[in-house]
Amino acid sequence: MLTFSFLTLFPELLTPFAQEAIVGKARERGLIDVRLVNLRDYAQNKHLKVDDTPYGGGAGMVIRVDVAARALDAACQAGPRPDEVILFTPAGERFTQQVAEELANKQHLVFLCGRYEGFDARVEGLVTRELSLGDFVMMGGEAAAACVLEAVARLRPGVLGDEASHQQDSFSSGLLDYPEYTRPPEWEGHSVPDVLRGGNHAAVARWRRDQALERTLRRRPDLLPGAGLTPQDSAALLALGVTPEQLSIWDAPPPPAPKVRRKKKPSAEDKAPTDTSSE
C-alpha cells in the first residue's frame, strides 16, 4: 500500500480529493492511504501561529522551520519510513508522468504544502526532493498536492478498473493520447471515423497510433524524440510532412522499405507459342 502524507495549513482543501471518486474508493479498498497533517497542531503557542516576518524585511510571512520539522517528525512516526519528503515550490523539478510513475513505486510519500511566502529556507534540509507543476505561482501547495495525488494514485495496481488504461494515456506512451469517440455515431454533421466501427482491431490500433502521432506533431513536437518511434511511425510522420532530415534529428528509424511485387513466372503453357494458323 502507498501512503500519502500531506503537511498543510488547510487540510480541508485536500479532504474532498482524498474521500471522493476513484481516490476515495481506493482508500476504502486499502489500496492507498491518505493522511492530512495540520501544521497548526505543531505550533506550540497559544494562538497556533506557524509563521513569522522574514529576516531582512519584505512583504508576507514565512512558515517556521521548527513547526515544519515537528509536523514532519509526527508524520514519520505515524507511518512507515518515508521514501521521499517532497516540497512543492516553483523552483523545484518539473512534475511529469515519468516522475509520477517513479513515485507510484514507493511506499510512503510525505508532501510539504506551503502558503504565504513559503517555508523558511532551512526546510530544504528536511526534504529529499522539490517539485513544481510548472512555471507559475499559486497561493499554496494544496492544489499541486491534489494533482500529484491523482496522478500517482491512479498508477497503483488495482486503483483503476482497467489495468491497461493508464498505459494508453498521454505521455505514458511518449505521445499525446489519440481522440476517443462514443455514441451517437452522428452528431450535428460530425461522424465517428469508419475505421473505429469496422471491427478490424489491427486497423484500429494503427489509426490510433497515427492519430497520436499527428496530434503530438501538431501540439507537442518536443515529445517525439523520446517517444520510441517505430519504422511504421516514421512512415506515418513522413506522410504528415515531416522531412527525412527531421526524422534523423529525432533518431527515428527509417521507414519500412516498399514492398516490391515479384512478377509471376510464366508457366509452360504461357511459354508455348500460340497457333494462329487456320485449318
Curated annotation (Swiss-Prot):
Record carries keyword Thylakoid: no
Keywords annotated in UniProt: Cytoplasm, Methyltransferase, S-adenosyl-L-methionine, Transferase, tRNA processing
Catalytic activity: guanosine(37) in tRNA + S-adenosyl-L-methionine = N(1)-methylguanosine(37) in tRNA + S-adenosyl-L-homocysteine + H(+)
Region (Disordered): 245-279
Primary enzyme class: transferase
Alphabetical list of Pfam families matching this protein: tRNA_m1G_MT (PF01746)
EC numbers on record: 2.1.1.228
SUPFAM superfamilies from the UniProt entry: alpha/beta knot
Entry-linked InterPro entries: Alpha/beta_knot_MTases (IPR029028), tRNA_m1G_MeTrfase_C_sf (IPR023148), tRNA_m1G_MeTrfase_TrmD (IPR002649), tRNA_m1G_MTases_N (IPR029026), tRNA_MeTrfase_TRMD/TRM10 (IPR016009)
Record localization: Cytoplasm
GO-annotated biological processes: tRNA N1-guanine methylation
Binding, S-adenosyl-L-methionine: 114, 133-138
Assembly: Homodimer.
Family statement drawn from the similarity comment of this UniProt entry: Belongs to the RNA methyltransferase TrmD family.
Protein's UniProt name: tRNA (guanine-N(1)-)-methyltransferase
Organism in which the protein naturally occurs: Deinococcus radiodurans (strain ATCC 13939 / DSM 20539 / JCM 16871 / CCUG 27074 / LMG 4051 / NBRC 15346 / NCIMB 9279 / VKM B-1422 / R1)
Gene transcribed to yield this protein: trmD
